[in-house]
Amino acid sequence: ELKGKKLGIHAYGNVGRNVARIAKGFGMEIFAFDAFCPKEVIEKDGVKAVDSADELYSACDVVSLHIPTTAETKNSINYALVNKLPKGGVLVNTARKEVINEAELIQLMEERGDLKYMTDIMPAAHETFAAKFVGRYFSTPKKMGAQTAEANINAGIAAAQQIVGFLKDGCEKFRVNKK
């Protein structure tokens, strides 16, 4: 049952915003933390902005990760942070596997039989997770976010529109290598 559950969105970019939109349809209470997104932007969407990752994990039944892998975020989802989840907490990783400190998450899940972990990219320690946490761990074999025919078509259309926007108007909104 998702209705009435508290969902935490860790990073409120495009994917995080869409997760919030969908979760609202299930009647979830939505919280978000993003170190780079202004609170006003988050709250404009009817989402409760919090001041820290610690606050997000403490407040929410489910946390959905959308952070990129950077030097600062690598292994940042660790024992201390995930242990803040309330009893029965669920961590959903649709970000990158490198943000998870797998050894610490395994240790925590051994200590807390109430935690669940779901990820759409197979962790390096998949066999350990699968053997030790039956019914509390789920993984897909590879990053599945854009592996449908529709997603690939939409990605092609979006790329074409962005190229036209750049050539026609000089729009650099989606430029990757900003100077």
Where would I find each of the regions flagged by the language model?
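Residues at the starts of beta-strands that form the adenosine-phosphate
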Residues: 20, 28-29
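Short, flexible hinge/linker loops that cap or flank conserved catalytic cores
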Residues: 1-3, 24, 83
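Glycine-rich NAD(P)-binding loop of Rossmann-like domains
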Residues: 1-18
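Rossmann-like adenosine-cofactor binding region
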Residues: 36-131
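Short, structured coil segments at secondary-structure junctions
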Residues: 26, 45-46, 133-136
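A structural signal for isolated positions on well-ordered beta-strands in alpha/beta enzyme cores
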Residues: 8, 31, 116-118
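C-terminal helix-to-coil terminal segments
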Residues: 116, 121-179
